[in-house]
Amino acid sequence: MTIGRTLRAGVLALQGDVREHLAALEACGAEAVPIRRASELADLDGLVLPGGESTAIDRLIRAFELSEPLKAFIASGKPVYGSCSGMILLADRIADPALDRDGAPQRTLGGLDVTVRRNAFGRQRDSFETELKFDSLSDSERPVHAVFIRAPWIEQAGSEVEVLAVVRIEGIDRAVAVRSGNLLATSFHPEVLVQESETSELRVHELLVSMMASRLSQDANQAESRK
């Protein structure tokens, strides 16, 4: 069944790489919109949780009363992609959560059966770029040019989580891209390269848009079968 309309993707727009993700999604043919209110989630086919500062985004999510609506969106099965701090927000567990002034650990939205470590590759000065083999992308034989900025890695993943890319650190393969059902997460920032012609990387966002199209088609087929 054909979709018959433009896919609508939201980018949580409280802090972080919002404009870059909007541009990447538009370049993939989706209608991309910033999301700041719970009511704006209703008409989305998919959602991006952008890179930024995970503790700041956690505080803003609570301040804007978005925690429960976002958890409900994730639980709905619609595709969600988290990059860098977005991966932290999707994780069920944080190995080293930041603490607020009262000693309470930062919270996540959850949904992805992984344990992440914040700033695992180091601080801002330790940011780096590398070429990654990334399964499940179009032209998967061509490596992804990945930008890591104060990035997390995944220390443990559940049995239903598929590891799509790893970085080898001190002899250990660290998972930096995973998928579980319609949840997708990367430690790195593909969105920052969208405007750079020599290294432009849209394939991660193309994967998200493909997931959105598949979900919408499944919903349409189920609705048709109930008639």
From Swiss-Prot:
List of residues binding L-glutamine: G52, E53, S54, R118, I149, R150
Keywords on record: Glutamine amidotransferase, Hydrolase, Lyase, Pyridoxal phosphate
Function: Catalyzes the hydrolysis of glutamine to glutamate and ammonia as part of the biosynthesis of pyridoxal 5'-phosphate. The resulting ammonia molecule is channeled to the active site of PdxS.
SUPFAM superfamilies per UniProt: Class I glutamine amidotransferase-like (SSF52317)
Organism of origin: Renibacterium salmoninarum (strain ATCC 33209 / DSM 20767 / JCM 11484 / NBRC 15589 / NCIMB 2235)
Similarity comment: Belongs to the glutaminase PdxT/SNO family.
The keyword Transmembrane helix is annotated on this UniProt entry: no
Catalytic activity: aldehydo-D-ribose 5-phosphate + D-glyceraldehyde 3-phosphate + L-glutamine = pyridoxal 5'-phosphate + L-glutamate + phosphate + 3 H2O + H(+); L-glutamine + H2O = L-glutamate + NH4(+)
Subunit annotation: In the presence of PdxS, forms a dodecamer of heterodimers. Only shows activity in the heterodimer.
Pfam families listed in its UniProt record: SNO (PF01174)
This enzyme's EC code(s): 4.3.3.6, 3.5.1.2
Gene3D superfamilies to which the protein is assigned, alphabetical: 3.40.50.880
Record-annotated active site: C84 (nucleophile), H189 (charge relay system), E191 (charge relay system)
Name by which UniProt lists this protein: Pyridoxal 5'-phosphate synthase subunit PdxT
